[in-house]
Design a protein with these regions (language model features):
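Alpha-helical transmembrane segments of multi-pass membrane transport and lipid-handling proteins
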Residues: 76-127, 160
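Alpha-helical transmembrane segments
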Residues: 131-142, 192-209
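Membrane-interface helix-loop junctions in multi-pass transport and translocation proteins
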Residues: 145, 155-189, 203, 207, ...
Length: 245
């Protein structure tokens, strides 16, 4: 379903943009910014969540089969906490979106758009990471069809949102960003409701979400301020040097 969603997004975007008389080269270029820049960067922390969910399946399966549900919930809590400690600070990419894009994808024609959609959609990292871990939890307790069902439901609702956004607004690439954020949020929500249903798991909020989020906000602000300060200082130094020469 994850792979299907990518194909669906590309097909809808290209077809609807063509219907709205956008040149196919322009539409392809826009989608390339989404898939080749934004999505590549977003997937880095999500890949770490994937590895975490894969590694935790044996421990969760073992404790679940032994009917040690308390220990099983402990494994789930540790996995979610560890994943959030990685993924929540990763939204700091939004604060440093321009220098990141300037280093990795320095094409001047699309850098401003790539920076803007990264800043807009970086929060989806949290939703994708959490849904990935909850996928692993559900697979670990033998509910392998539940994540598939949740992803299918999320995909249908994703298409229901994306289609009118593309048809009736001029959001263009931002419609894709908003719709994929919605898709990730729905998967996250449905998977976590399923984990609660089958394990009786209730998520602790302060240590797992609130503290990393507060720390990440402070980190993002400081990184942005220091980057801008250093940039202005170095620009002044090099500008003066060039002027003297």
């Amino acid at each position: 379903v994850y792979n299907i969603s990518t194909v669906v997004d590309q097909t809808l975007f290209m077809d609807i943009m063509g219907f709205k008389r956008m040149a196919s080269e322009t539409a392809a270029s826009l989608y390339g910014v989404f898939s080749g820049k934004y999505w590549v960067l977003i997937n880095v922390p999500i890949a770490l969540a994937n590895s975490m969910s894969t590694a935790m399946i044996p421990a969760i399966s073992g404790s679940y089969e032994l009917k040690d549900y308390k220990k099983c919930r402990g494994h789930v809590r540790q996995a979610i906490h560890f994943t959030m400690v990685i993924s929540i600070p990763a939204i700091g990419m939004g604060a440093l979106a321009y220098p990141i894009m300037e280093v990795l994808f320095p094409q001047k024609a699309t850098i401003d758009l790539a920076v803007s959609i990264l800043r807009t959609g970086c929060i989806s990292i949290i939703f994708y990471a959490l849904s990935t871990v909850s996928n692993g939890v559900l697979q670990g307790i033998g509910k392998v069809n539940i994540p598939l069902r949740n992803a299918a439901v999320s995909l249908v609702l994703h298409v229901v949102l994306l289609t009118p956004l593309l048809y009736f607004t001029n959001l263009n690439l931002y419609a894709l960003v908003f719709a994929t954020m919605f898709y990730a949020f729905l998967m996250c929500l449905l998977n976590n409701l399923s984990v609660r249903k089958y394990l009786g798991y209730h998520q602790e909020m302060k240590r797992t979400f609130m503290i990393p989020l507060l720390s990440s906000v402070i980190m993002g602000i400081l990184c942005y301020v220091f980057y801008q300060g250093i940039y202005l200082i170095l620009s002044g130094i090099f500008g003066s040097f060039i002027h003297l020469r």
